[in-house]
């Protein structure tokens, strides 16, 4: 939607037009889809190894989203499984020398807060220890009505953190723009 300008609700209706527009973009986009909890980090690593053998080296990997991956090793507590998944994704980033991005949700205390901090990250706080960079997007009910919100740099291993940015956010077109310098 953010590439073609078609609203998310219209994507299925304009598949042919969208396919043509995407073909004109430089580079290669490879999308691999798995059912929830059917793929693990080993599945992702195996796919990346196959691409590497074909001469395709990823420049960027997006996992949507890590909390829904199947753990390589079953553990008693979900939080330790999640920590392991995030550690494995970090290892993939190192081994393939490219960034790996994923998303996570907040716990209930993160609903409708003005700024989401690492304290509100769902299920396993240890995910935060593994990550090099964490940002959050928060939107109150009023923000949702006004297509606004806040972006907070919660962690930045290699630079400044703690900055809050006002953003424009139109979910229908996946349009997000930073509106100012940090507060």
Language model region names:
Residues 11-16, 58-59, 89-91, 128-131, ...:
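Short, surface-exposed, polar/charged, turn-prone segments marking secondary-structure boundaries
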Residues 13-23, 121-123, 152-156:
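Intrinsically disordered, low-complexity boundary segments flanking structured domains
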Residues 142-183:
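P-loop/Walker A phosphate-binding loop and immediately adjacent motor/lid segment at beta-alpha junctions
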Residues 5, 115-119, 166, 173:
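Generic secondary-structure boundary/loop-capping signal
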Residues 1-57, 71, 164-167:
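Cytosolic-facing regulatory segments adjacent to core modules
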Residues 2, 6, 134, 156-160:
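Phosphate/oxyanion-binding loops and surfaces in catalytic or ligand/nucleic-acid-binding neighborhoods
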Residues 33-152, 158:
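P-loop NTPase motor core
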Residues 12-15, 73, 122-125, 171-173:
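Solvent-exposed, flexible loop/coil residues
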């Amino acid at each position: 939607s953010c590439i073609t300008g078609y609203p998310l609700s219209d994507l299925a209706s304009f598949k042919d037009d969208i396919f043509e527009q995407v073909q004109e973009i430089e580079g290669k986009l490879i999308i691999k889809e798995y059912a929830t909890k059917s793929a693990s980090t080993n599945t992702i690593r195996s796919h990346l190894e196959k691409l590497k053998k074909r001469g395709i080296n990823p420049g960027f990997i997006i996992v949507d989203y890590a909390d829904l991956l199947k753990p390589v090793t079953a553990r008693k507590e979900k939080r330790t499984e999640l920590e392991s998944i995030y550690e494995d994704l970090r290892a993939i980033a190192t081994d393939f020398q490219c960034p790996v991005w994923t998303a996570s949700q907040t716990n209930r205390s993160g609903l409708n807060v003005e700024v989401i901090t690492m304290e509100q990250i769902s299920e396993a706080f240890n995910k935060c220890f593994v990550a090099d960079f964490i940002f959050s997007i928060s939107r109150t009910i009023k923000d949702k009505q006004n297509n606004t919100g806040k972006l907070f740099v919660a962690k930045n291993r290699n630079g400044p953190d703690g900055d809050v940015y006002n953003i424009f956010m139109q979910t229908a077109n996946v349009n997000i723009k930073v509106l100012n310098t940090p507060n």
